[in-house]
């Protein structure tokens, strides 16, 4: 079996009024009584090389065709009708601006009517077929008319060739809706899909691929055709006898990537129906995006999905002799067809960018309008396979960035966000830093978007445990079943995998918070909600969260004490490492209460560690001596074993605490003095004896009594607190006790 694609010379059909297949030309011996040697172009006008004067003028755009009525009347039903209906004197003037294919197609159709040989190629056959349909050149007027012969060329030549099918489909872009109505687009799409899905074992054909290294293609005295172009692709022909190599699974990516987005979608849809592996479908979609949206893909080509990379790396599992291709210069002997130029590259510079350029600048450089950009993004979103890991998470996030920038339909953006949530653990910080296109400049980055992605991830993690994960087609149903399957982390849905994914996402979120915390416009609520979105079990260490909190405090120095405490509540001090604790102990931006919690938690951890160590040592020693006496270290032993740096931090904290306690005692003393003065005033008031045993005096007296009792109680509580502080190792003189006054009403 072989797909022949060496039709550069213009494979065609010829006929002597009948159905004969010649050597690459389309002709008719019936010239309607007008003998001609050909057509002549003079400026913007075509003339028939004959002595008979022209009696028909056809205008198509800027071109004029000076023809004769009879050759066209005998083969075109539309021309027959238009000329009959026309009341113009000779020469009859017809304007056919709506003719599909334009002046080029009408020129070929006119030559066919005059019996001039016409070269049929993959680049002109679709326009000529549509023009023949427009002109109604059917079999009713003549056997072997233009419709029949162009259909024969399409069916027997084009559709059997991979390269010609691509070229014809590309040429149909300017022939809508004629190419659609004549099923040219559908037939070419299905032909391409069938060839792309066929197992390449034992099949040889020509296709466009990436150029091999110069050391393998630098032939003496010759220059390969693919090397004539600056493009990185080349033409692989089955007729070359050079070093053979197995065909990679992505051999067809480069060719289908030149198609317009609507035709590309038709091809991918047909390929999907035939059962192509979802990894290959995802890889070709990323390849297409790299061609038409160069700012979307990182420099260096398409990043193949994890499963796809293992498939390509493992190869097809075929022997080198079972299927091979030959790459080299294309034969030019007798070829009058279109120059292949190393591949089907009508958008050669689409995928070549130096560095990470802005998406808008790259797209503008291609001359793609915003409307077309939006159509490309929406179409790519709609054809991404539903299976997890069909495309990389990095690609999805870049596509999401472009979708937000181009104002894509909200339903498609929501669907894309769910896809990102399915594999959110594969994301990187650089991909998450998506500018806030829709928040009217409130924040530098779209934090709400990351919050939604995280919610989709958590929902996905919850459903994975209860329902089977999205499984790929079984090997018996998958295209290229012998390709080794990569480890997608896609099956099982075990708790261990889920927990590891949550831990990776937690580290990613902490890094993201550290980056966006520098934005002065970021509200505290958004920071707190994103930090608390993950469950506590997702973080075994809160160092990353502490780093993000510290960055937020640096960028927002005007936060109140309450807001700083509220911010620090998202962090668990017991999950901080020793380095983070030492940094927090000296961090003046943290509230004092948080610093004390950090130091206390670290001291508790050190005490427990020392206690466990001493307990193990005593247990080992007791077992060796035959006795077991557990040794509980006292406070002095623990403090002496504490690292010096930690003791210094704890001493500074204790000094601050003692200062606060001293100030509190001063306030209490002043309060007691005021209480004494108040009681003296009360007694003086009672001795006046102006009004006795009245409701008002009773109220005053009871009020003073209650206030006195409350004062004594608060004094007693403060005394208990200070006593507790002394027990904790703080040496202060006991507070002065207030004199006990006898309260009497006399």
UniProtKB/Swiss-Prot annotation:
Tree of life domain: Eukaryota
Post-translational modification: Phosphorylated in the dark.
Annotated PROSITE patterns: BTB, NPH3
Record-annotated disulphide pairs: none
Alphabetically ordered keywords of this record: Cell membrane, Membrane, Phosphoprotein, Transducer, Ubl conjugation pathway
Residue intervals of the NPH3 domain: 250-605
Keyword Endoplasmic reticulum: no
Low complexity: bias regions: 466-478
Residue stretches of biased makeup (Basic residues): 735-746
Pathway where this protein functions: Protein modification; protein ubiquitination
Domain BTB: 54-122
Chain intervals with Gly residues compositional bias: 9-19
Tissue expression summary: Expressed in hypocotyls, guard cells and mesophyll cells.
Induction of the gene: In the root, up-regulated by red light.
Protein family membership: Belongs to the NPH3 family.
Domain notes: The BTB/POZ domain mediates the interaction with some component of ubiquitin ligase complexes.
Function text: May act as a substrate-specific adapter of an E3 ubiquitin-protein ligase complex (CUL3-RBX1-BTB) which mediates the ubiquitination and subsequent proteasomal degradation of target proteins. Signal transducer of the phototropic response and photo-induced movements. Involved in the phot1 pathway under low blue light (LBL) fluence rate and in the phot2 pathway under higher fluence rate of blue light (HBL). Necessary for root and hypocotyl phototropisms, but not for the regulation of stomata opening. Not involved in chloroplast accumulation and translocation.
Name of the molecule in the record: Root phototropism protein 3
UniProt gene name: RPT3
